[in-house]
Curated annotation (Swiss-Prot):
Lineage: Eukaryota, Metazoa, Ecdysozoa, Nematoda, Chromadorea
Effect of T23N: Dominant-negative mutant. Mislocalizes to the cytoplasm instead of membranes. Hardly any basolateral endosomal tubules of the intestine
Example of a GO MF term: myosin V binding
PROSITE patterns the record matches: RAB
Region feature Disordered, mapped onto this chain: 175-201
Name of the protein in its database record: Ras-related protein Rab-10
Free-text tissue specificity from the UniProt record: Almost ubiquitously expressed. Expressed in intestine, hypodermis, seam cells, body-wall muscles, many neurons, oviduct sheath cell, spermatheca, coelomocytes and pharyngeal and nerve ring.
Superkingdom of source: Eukaryota
Originating species: Caenorhabditis elegans
GO CC terms in record: axon; cholinergic synapse; dense core granule; early endosome; early endosome membrane; endosome; Golgi apparatus; Golgi medial cisterna
Gene encoding the protein: rab-10
Biased composition (Polar residues): 184-201
Annotated SMART domains: ARF, RAB, RAN, RAS, RHO
């Protein structure tokens, strides 16, 4: 049997309100592309990117979930099997930041107890329109014992760093004996309906 082209498979989720830039972050990382004309994501889509970390080839399966309230019943099932979750807010949108607490509760309710979480304050290139200080982002992350980055999908600021940090944190929690298991337990579950359309930047 031919060897798989990767050693481990990690399922990651991008969670947050609509319009915070989840899809732009995803496409910046997966394709090094940025498009300001993305329409709002309908349902759920995912991208694949394989990275090298600590001498291992890790296949990242990154799911882009719609943030609108009406889609919560759809996204809930996608928490299952997630090993890492990025909670994204827009530094120019106070409501999207306030809702991070709600998303954290949602994760606590539906995701695995040992899932690795990270908070991203996106659109840090728009400092003239900032309404959420970096300190507030750092504090909510610190309060929940999770890591934090400010990112810009537009200017490609800290996007790669965030994904690599999340993958490294997941890898650090996994003993070597789980390598084979990780290949098989987080294979893609096809959603009933997918869209390749994007979200906002």
């Amino acid at each position: 049997m031919a060897r798989r082209p990767y050693d481990m498979l990690f399922k990651l989720l991008l969670i947050g309100d609509s319009g915070v830039g989840k899809t732009c972050i995803l496409y910046r990382f997966s394709d090094d592309a940025f498009n300001t004309t993305f329409i709002s994501t309908i349902g759920i889509d995912f991208k694949i990117k394989t990275i090298e970390l600590k001498g291992k080839k890790i296949k990242l399966q990154i799911w882009d979930t719609a943030g609108q309230e009406r889609f919560h019943t759809i996204t809930t099932s996608y928490y299952r099997g997630a090993m890492g979750i990025m909670l994204v807010y827009d530094i120019t949108n106070a409501k999207s930041f306030d809702n991070i607490a709600k998303w954290l509760r949602n994760i606590d309710e539906h995701a695995s107890e040992d899932v690795v979480k990270m908070i991203l304050g996106n659109k840090c290139d728009m400092s003239d329109r900032r309404v959420v200080s970096r300190e507030r982002g750092e504090k909510i992350a610190q309060d929940h014992g999770i890591s934090f980055h400010e990112t810009s999908a537009k200017l490609n600021v800290h996007v790669d760093t965030a994904f690599y940090d999340l993958a490294e944190a997941i890898l650090a929690k996994m003993p070597d004996s789980t390598d084979e298991q990780s290949r098989d337990t987080v294979n893609p579950v096809q959603p009933q309906r997918q869209s390749s359309s994007g979200g906002c930047c």
